Amino acid sequence: MSQPNSQQPTIVKCPTCQNKVVWNTESEFRPFCSKKCQMIDFGEWADEEKSIAGAPDMSDSDGWSSEPY
């Protein structure tokens, strides 16, 4: 008779400090290891040190006008 599969907890790396974090409901700040690492990451996004790649911003030469239609 085989034993039931005991699931190993999912372990991820904290995006800020690379410490190991158990991914479960008790990990309050997941994927971060702590509130400090969470706030460091938030600050980097707020300061625009991090961004998601997208289309370039429109410039004045793109035909944009502040004049109403």
Swiss-Prot record:
Its cofactor is Zn(2+). Pfam families: YacG. Zn(2+) binds at C14, C17, C33, C37. GO terms for biological process: regulation of DNA-templated transcription. InterPro entries: DNA_gyrase_inhibitor_YacG, Znf_NHR/GATA. Binds 1 zinc ion. The keyword Metal-binding applies. GO terms for molecular function: DNA topoisomerase type II (double strand cut, ATP-hydrolyzing) inhibitor activity; zinc ion binding. Transmembrane segments: none annotated. SUPFAM superfamilies: Glucocorticoid receptor-like (DNA-binding domain). Keywords: Metal-binding, Zinc. Belongs to the DNA gyrase inhibitor YacG family. Interacts with GyrB. Inhibits all the catalytic activities of DNA gyrase by preventing its interaction with DNA. Acts by binding directly to the C-terminal domain of GyrB, which probably disrupts DNA binding by the gyrase. This is DNA gyrase inhibitor YacG. The lineage of its organism: Bacteria, Pseudomonadati, Pseudomonadota, Gammaproteobacteria, Vibrionales. The gene is yacG.
